[in-house]
């Protein structure tokens, strides 16, 4: 079960992940054995970019990150992909190596949607997740290609190694939820892991990027399904996993 993690609404929305250059596919044969018992989750590490301050004051979220529902939402939900344990561990260790420790509150993750409305959880969100997950087979992914963000580094998935499969799942969900998605969630999507962000020193980021380019050998894994987290008054709480069908 996931641990609770405090984070601001805007941090949950992931607004700082701005690509500086697009990833290019890379060939890599590194293999990792999947484990079907893993749950991707938020860790209880030092908090990342807490924009509420020590007093716990809640800032009004930007309209870009707000679901298009008729009333203000008491809670929103974050949807990520669920991967095997070994793949998740390797990417999390890489994130811990490069992400500023005082800001790193999360384990490695690929976010599909940042602010799903809690008011539609039982009516639309979970039924759609169950339907699409039941019709989707587990698939291979390869975290292969490092690329720059404005203030950090990410690792992308080649189209033929999980990129297209992840995008297809995202597009199905996006079509089903088009009436209420936030502007951010209704926009474009490119599957990636963020391993460094929120670093203002361009020289530091570039040096780290060059090191990652030199040392990163890729990481194979298996996408087992989807994980849903509740954003609730500063906490990211694991809610439910939606498993894909076995690949064979």
List each language-model region with its residue ranges.
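Histidine-dependent nucleotide/RNA phosphoesterase domain, centered on the 2H-phosphoesterase fold
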Residues: 2-248
């Amino acid at each position: 079960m996931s641990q609770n993690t405090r984070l601001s609404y805007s941090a949950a929305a992931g607004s700082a992940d701005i690509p500086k250059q697009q990833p290019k596919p890379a060939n890599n044969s590194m293999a990792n054995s999947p484990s079907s018992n893993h749950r991707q989750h938020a860790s209880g590490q030092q908090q990342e970019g807490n924009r509420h301050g020590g007093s716990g004051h809640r800032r009004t979220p930007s309209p870009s990150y707000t679901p298009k529902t008729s009333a203000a939402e008491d809670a929103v939900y974050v949807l990520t992909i669920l991967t095997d344990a070994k793949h998740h561990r390797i990417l999390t260790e890489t994130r811990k190596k490069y992400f500023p420790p005082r800001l790193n509150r999360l384990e490695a993750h690929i976010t599909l949607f940042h602010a799903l409305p809690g008011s539609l959880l039982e009516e639309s969100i979970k039924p759609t997740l169950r339907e699409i997950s039941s019709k989707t087979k587990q698939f291979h992914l390869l975290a292969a290609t490092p690329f720059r963000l404005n203030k950090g580094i990410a690792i992308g998935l080649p189209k033929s190694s999980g990129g297209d499969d992840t995008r297809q799942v995202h597009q199905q969900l996006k079509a089903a939820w088009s009436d209420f998605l936030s502007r951010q969630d209704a926009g474009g999507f490119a599957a990636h892991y963020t391993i460094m962000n929120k670093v203002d020193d361009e020289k530091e980021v570039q040096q780290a990027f060059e090191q990652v380019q030199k040392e990163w050998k890729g990481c194979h894994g298996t996408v087992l399904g989807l994980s849903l987290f509740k954003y609730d008054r500063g906490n990211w709480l694991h809610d439910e996993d939606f498993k894909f069908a076995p690949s064979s």
